[in-house]
Regions:
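Hydrophobic, aromatic-enriched alpha-helical segments typical of multi-pass transmembrane helices
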Residues: 1-154
Length: 154
């Protein structure tokens, strides 16, 4: 990290990744909004739960994204200003830890819930072949269980 060019390139990569994650958060909500009129005919409660869960997932993703962009700002604005290196390291590691936890909660837990809800709605409605809906019914709980395992250090 001693060479400024390397740091600038890494910051640009993080910014590009942030742009992609922003697009992900927007499309998560867009997917739920597009599916809302279709799946609400089966169960308005489950359809609303799906939309709410997608919104929560997107919010969690954005929180993690903000923490990662804060690390870039911390590096660019304060590291060169002669701030205490130990304090900056602790703050940076804390912000990265926030990103890691939000990655577990958003794409971990919420995706499992979303898969289960959507799989059940599609299974009941017959909008997709049953075998395809079963992927959501089986995959959702597996993703959720995987996130729980990671949460407890497995």
């Amino acid at each position: 990290m001693a060479e400024p060019g390397i740091c600038d390139a890494r910051a640009q990569c993080i910014r590009l990744g942030a742009l992609c994650e922003s697009f992900l958060a927007i499309t998560n909500i867009g997917t739920a909004v597009v599916l809302w009129p279709i799946v609400k005919r089966q169960s308005e409660t489950l359809a609303l739960s799906y939309v709410a869960s997608r919104v929560v997932e997107s919010i969690i993703i954005v929180v993690g994204l903000i923490s990662l962009l804060s690390v870039v700002t911390l590096r660019e604005d304060f590291a060169g200003a002669g701030a205490d290196a130990g304090s900056l390291t602790i703050a940076g590691k804390s912000l990265v830890a926030i990103h890691d936890w939000t990655f577990l909660l958003g794409p971990g837990f919420c995706v499992g819930v979303n898969g289960l809800l959507l799989g059940y709605l599609f299974y009941r409605s017959g909008l997709v072949p049953r075998w395809m809906a079963i992927f959501g019914l089986v995959g959702g709980p597996l993703i959720f269980a995987s996130a729980i395992a990671v949460l407890f250090g497995a």
